[in-house]
């Protein structure tokens, strides 16, 4: 059902203008930039996309624009997760209407929901997605929901679930999931362990830094398929040097600043309460943008 979703999927950023409104022109440029750099698909409206500081209407607009801009050229996964099941269902129905290939939802957070309530939440979204496969999104560090291996096994075997986005540094658990579910599409979620995640059993990844250097991650996939561990390690090291800087600057605003210097995003701002990049990092981010543009050619 979801085997065609394997690959390198950029977790799409959402550009805003100086007034904090959705910047549709920059969003369209960013989609095209990702297509041109050779990624396999886009994961739209997730953590990287600042979904939880947007209205439901804005999230639907983003889905519609991305679908219009891609025109079936790449795979599209719509993150529709909200704390509210009803709102998640509304977004899932919109994703189906706009022609997305799959939906995804983070575990409902903030309130201490029972595991059965989590399962019911996913069942309802799957029903509203009307046949689109579900990508369960496990990100305990941000959601605060720490699923056990048995609970993950239960979620990924719900009817309609086709994939898991495993944003966790627990590579042992990644391997356990792969061993238990050989046909499950399994995404590595932390960019800094992409190569390790693939070796632990992931089919590909969904990541924020793919927006600026997706070709490097494709290079890691290619190297590992060819048994070239040395090249994969070298590429991962180069990716991690970038990630080291982005962690200092704030990842999303740092990425937007790099894309601003690449003439992709007009305004390098995230939505408040996120603040701007500290000016002391701007020279490093500008140099990084120039380096990546030269490398990409």
Swiss-Prot record:
Binding site residues for aceneuramate: 47-48, 167, 189, 191-192, 208
InterPro entries in alphabetical order: Aldolase_TIM (IPR013785), DapA-like (IPR002220), NanA (IPR005264), Schiff_base-form_aldolases_AS (IPR020625), Schiff_base-form_aldolases_CS (IPR020624)
Reaction equations catalysed: aceneuramate = aldehydo-N-acetyl-D-mannosamine + pyruvate
Active-site residues, as the UniProt record annotates them: 137 (proton donor), 165 (schiff-base intermediate with substrate)
GO biological process: carbohydrate metabolic process; N-acetylneuraminate catabolic process
SUPFAM superfamilies reported for this sequence: Aldolase
Subcellular location: Cytoplasm
Broad class of enzyme this protein falls into: lyase
Record keywords, A-Z: Carbohydrate metabolism, Cytoplasm, Lyase, Schiff base
Chief subcellular location: cytoplasm
Gene Ontology terms, MF aspect: N-acetylneuraminate lyase activity
Associated pathway: Amino-sugar metabolism; N-acetylneuraminate degradation; D-fructose 6-phosphate from N-acetylneuraminate: step 1/5
GO CC terms, sorted: cytosol
Job of this protein: Catalyzes the reversible aldol cleavage of N-acetylneuraminic acid (sialic acid; Neu5Ac) to form pyruvate and N-acetylmannosamine (ManNAc) via a Schiff base intermediate.
Family: Belongs to the DapA family. NanA subfamily.
Subunit: Homotetramer.
The name this protein goes by in its record: N-acetylneuraminate lyase
Naturally occurring in which organism (per UniProt): Shigella boydii serotype 4 (strain Sb227)
Species classification: Bacteria, Pseudomonadati, Pseudomonadota, Gammaproteobacteria, Enterobacterales
């Amino acid at each position: 059902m979801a085997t065609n979703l394997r690959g390198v999927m950029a977790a799409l950023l959402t550009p805003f203008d100086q007034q904090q409104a959705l910047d549709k022109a920059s969003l369209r440029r960013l989609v095209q930039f990702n297509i041109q750099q050779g990624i396999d698909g886009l994961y739209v409206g997730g953590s990287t996309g600042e979904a939880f500081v947007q209205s439901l209407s804005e999230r639907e607009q983003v889905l519609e624009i991305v679908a219009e801009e891609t025109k079936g050229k790449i795979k599209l996964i719509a993150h529709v997760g909200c704390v509210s099941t009803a709102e998640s269902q509304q977004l899932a129905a919109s994703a189906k209407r706009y022609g997305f290939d799959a939906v995804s939802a983070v575990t409902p957070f903030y309130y201490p929901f029972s595991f059965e309530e989590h399962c019911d939440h996913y069942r309802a979204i799957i029903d509203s997605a009307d046949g689109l496969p579900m990508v369960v999104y496990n990100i305990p560090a941000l959601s605060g929901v720490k699923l056990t291996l048995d609970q993950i096994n239960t979620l990924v075997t719900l009817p309609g679930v086709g994939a898991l986005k495993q944003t966790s540094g627990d590579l042992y658990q990644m391997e356990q999931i792969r061993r238990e579910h050989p046909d499950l599409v399994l995404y590595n979620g932390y960019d800094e362990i992409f190569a390790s995640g693939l070796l632990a059993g992931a089919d590909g990844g969904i990541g924020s830094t793919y927006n600026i250097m997706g070709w490097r991650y494709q290079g890691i996939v290619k190297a590992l398929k060819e048994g070239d561990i040395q090249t994969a390690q070298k590429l991962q090291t180069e990716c991690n040097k970038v990630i080291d800087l982005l962690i200092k600057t704030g990842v999303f605003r740092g990425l937007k600043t790099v894309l601003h210097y690449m003439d992709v995003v007009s305004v390098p701002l995230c939505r408040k309460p996120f603040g701007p990049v500290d000016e002391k990092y701007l020279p490093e981010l500008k140099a990084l943008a120039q380096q990546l543009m030269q490398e990409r050619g």
